[in-house]
């Protein structure tokens, strides 16, 4: 696995529920159907890899032609704990179909979340300082065609809301959709 695939996530503790943690900065990629590799063609490494804990979720949507598109969000936990993990990007998509928002999670750090057709945007779910996020918002707007109903701007860069405003609107069904699967990753080694 390439180094760029190792992306630690930003973890935010839910202020109202113990052991519920919201994960941001997942890497979102479209799901591509893979061909099966016969077992005698698989390469087995002789180096014992360090085990990391991964977070993963796959979501799908159907377009007007009936075609299903799937996205997978993945991230790496550097220090796993006994918590239940949920995707903040999926929570954002639960109430914003085509839009974006900038949210504050610390004194100097912001989150940029965006939704296209009710799914997380591949180039969103990112964090950084004010300048980084401004650049990411500009890139998102330049690379994505504006929908007919215009982009819904939930929280602007000039006046970012607190990230907790996202989770206050969730129903129990939305919460189930946001749940992340926790697993071990042993396919790569760390330096």
Model features per residue range: what roles?
Residues 1-178:
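Cytosolic/nucleoplasmic/matrix-facing N-terminal domains/tails
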Residues 176-191:
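C-terminal single-pass membrane-anchor helix
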